[in-house]
Structures are given as C-alpha cells and as structure tokens.
Swiss-Prot record:
It catalyses: hydrogencarbonate + H(+) = CO2 + H2O; urea = cyanamide + H2O. It comes from the Eukaryota. Inhibited by acetazolamide. It comes from Macaca nemestrina. Keywords: Acetylation, Cytoplasm, Lyase, Metal-binding, Zinc. It is found in: Cytoplasm. It is an enzyme of class 4 (lyase). One of its GO terms (cellular component) is cytoplasm. This is Carbonic anhydrase 1. The gene is CA1. The active site is at 65 (proton donor/acceptor).
Length: 261
C-alpha cells in the first residue's frame, strides 16, 4: 500500500495527506486518543482468540517508511476470532510504528499519554471476502490488533524480528522470515478497547475494526534505535533513516470506544 506521494516529513506528511486522500478528514479516521473514563464497558464483547500457525510466516520487507512481516494467507491456519467479531479474520502481516525519540512513537494514545512504539497485527475478513485486496476497502474488511509499547526493559520476543532487519536495510529489500508466531508479542492480558476506524496511512480506508490492548509490552531504547536505523532510501542513494512513521491522533467525531473490561 506504500506509494511515493506520501510520507512522514513536513512536505508529504500527515498534515498534507488530505490533499491527495480527502478521506484523511473523514468521520472514522485512526488513530484516536482513548479516554478511559468515556470508554463504554460492553458485556457482549467476547474474549479475543488468536490462533497463529508459525509455519505461515513468510517474509520481511522494507517498504520505505517501515517494514512488514508478511504471512501466507491462502487458508485459515492463522486467524483472529472473538471480541466484537462474528466472522473469522485471517492474519496477513504485522508492522510497527515509532517516533524520532522515545517520548512518542505510538499512534494511539491513552488519556493523552503517548507510548514509544506501537505494534499492528493486520487481519482481513476471510469469511466474507476472497482476498486482502478485496477486503481492504470494505467497512468490515479488516481487523487490526494494536499493542502499545513502553520504553523500558529489552523485549526478548522482538529479537528474531530485529535480527532480520540487517537483511532489509534499504527500501524494496525482502528476505525470508519463517517459523514465527506473532501472538508471542501480545501482552499477557488481552483486555481491550475496540472502535471503528481506518488504516493509519494512505489510502486511509475506513475499513478497520481496531482492537487496542489495554496492557502494553516493553521495548528497550536500543531496540527502538534499531527500528530507526532502517533506511527509507533505495540501495545506492544517500542514506535516509526511517526516523518516524506515526500519524497524530484524529477526532472521534461521535464514535464510541467500547471496553471489554
């Protein structure tokens, strides 16, 4: 979904996206600030259930503004169920967002508090649609688990991902990334907030049901520095580190955030 007409600096960053993607000013944009006192506890929300088969992990790719870990998604070996969903959603990829300092980097915030980074695990509705490409623009097409990451202790669960970054230093590089279960990155509690929102970068489709975990996971300052050392340029060009790739929070515009707890 990356294209060269947008990015995260002053010239092509989030403040400019609406010129090319008017939906940037839509009514269901993400991320948002979760105000805990206004979130509505909803007893109808079921527990989140993830079942990921490590054999579906496929490859890691430098997409310029970030990196993606992609999964085989031609069957239901790796799925998300439960929560607000009646359908089953198939795992497609995960990626991270970060900032130029440890003070900020997450996209979602909680009561105005910014975290250092944020993990997004992306799934598409395989009960209703035949591919991610078909699902990505549909209102019930995508389900993304967001996990806030707080700077502190090094997180050993991230090590396999970080060790793979040297192989994809520049934009467009890809490398095999196999035998990995992203549920190992989830916090111990799967209490969550949920709301209807969007992709957080262009094309900004309002097609995402967000599951934001209440509990954060840890990441060390050194691990965050490894994210930032990824280069957004193609090989041979002047090195341009990916310093930040997070969109500021967007207005709720009347949407309700529900809590499972």
């Amino acid at each position: 979904m990356a294209s060269p007409d947008w990015g995260y600096d002053d010239k092509n960053g989030p403040e400019q996206w609406s010129k090319l993607y008017p939906i940037a000013n839509g009514n269901n944009q993400s991320p948002v600030d979760i105000k805990t006192s206004e979130a509505k506890h909803d007893t109808s929300l079921k527990p989140i259930s993830v079942s990921y088969n490590p054999a579906t992990a496929k490859e890691i790719i430098n997409v310029g503004h970030s990196f993606h870990v992609n999964f085989e998604d031609n069957d239901n070996r790796s799925v998300l169920k439960g929560g607000p969903f009646s359908d089953s959603y198939r795992l497609f990829q995960f990626h991270f967002h970060w900032g130029s300092s440890n003070e900020y980097g997450s996209e979602h915030t909680v009561d105005g508090v910014k975290y250092s980074s944020e993990l997004h695990i992306v799934h598409w509705n395989s009960a209703k649609y035949s591919s991610l490409a078909e699902a990505v623009s549909k209102a019930d097409g995508l389900a993304v688990i967001g996990v806030l990451m707080k700077v502190g202790e090094a997180n050993p669960k991230l090590q396999k991902v970080l060790d793979a970054l040297h192989a994809i230093k520049t934009k467009g590089k890809r490398a095999p990334f196999t035998n990995f279960d992203p549920s190992t990155l989830l916090p111990s509690s799967l209490d969550f907030w949920t709301y209807s929102g969007s992709l957080t970068h262009p094309p900004l489709y309002e097609s995402v049901t967000w599951i934001i975990c209440k509990e954060s996971i840890s990441v060390s300052s050194e691990q965050l520095a490894q994210f930032r050392s990824l280069l957004s340029n193609v090989e041979g060009d002047n090195p341009v580190p990916s310093q930040r790739n997070n969109r500021p929070t967007q207005p709720l515009k009347g949407r309700t955030v529900r809590a499972s707890f």
